[in-house]
Amino acid sequence: MEPIDDLTMCLEDPSQLDQLMSELRQRFTIKEGEGQPVDWLLGMRIHQNVEEGYLSMDQELAITKLAKVILDDNEMNSAHYVKHPMLHSSPLPRLAQDSPLRVTNKREFHMLSCCGSLLHIAGSTRPDVAAAVGILCRHAASFGRQHVNAAKRIVQYLYATRNMGLVYKCGDCRPECFSQGRHPKDDGTNRLVTFADSDFAMDETRRSCMGMVISMNGAPISWTSTLGKTVATSTAEAEVNAAVVAAKDSLHLRSMLQELGIDHGPIILHEDNSACIAQGNGGLRLVRNAKHYSTKLRWLQQVIVNGDVIFEYCPTAEQLADTFTKPLDEETFLKFRERMLVDVSHLL
């Protein structure tokens, strides 16, 4: 067997690519056609239009393949009726290993395989299903018929919206290319726009779900929907935990931009919890009611004092990270989805 490695590169000068490919050919066997613009990468379709100044990413093919495996013909035909991936009014129950409601025949439904495919899609081009997929995956080891229906609903939703994807733009891109899929706080430039939120004690374990999303050039570039490792005892603590996660990721991305020669100022962190903002902006001091999470709070205070992060209050109605903390009602979900994704079929 021959080892196969994939390498994706971004270069401004074509002569740099020629030089690099020449050096690689001296050491490795490279197939004909390599070194060309990327059209497909790990199931993602990438379309770049240099003249009009945008790049789109979607996973229509991967979603269609998954739907054909998970859904029957009737479920695929009725997929267009599914407007959002998970019902906010029907939480999924945890099933014990000896529960009679468990699906014991794993061949009846391959939940782990389905969750793996959904995680890849949710983490690559579909941030709108990140919260629903995260909730589903918590039940992958012990699931019942209700969980199977929830998995199929997510796949149906993805299949019905398989043409939606991310669109990134440069400064002079045509307005119609990004009139949707962009939050009002995102001006479409090389500037990181960060949102952080938390749903306090939402799980049966009373742990809080943390959500964050970072946008740049008109679309999300990083997002997270994860259950906290410990139980937060207040809304402020849960929000501080989410803010720390968002700030760490944002500072890492800022350092990458600086290596690319893009000068970036402080990270603007949008938060809708006044207590979290007050604790973070309070300077390097010990908050009496925050002793049990003082380490995370002190780190957050430090990056704010240093000028690396600036808190900005964001009303809950505009808090994009709310999408990543819990299933939302249809109207709110669709509003936030339009601020992240675009129908890319007319761009291809």
Segments the model singles out, each with a brief description of its role:
Residues 1-348:
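Long, low-complexity, charge-biased intrinsically disordered regions
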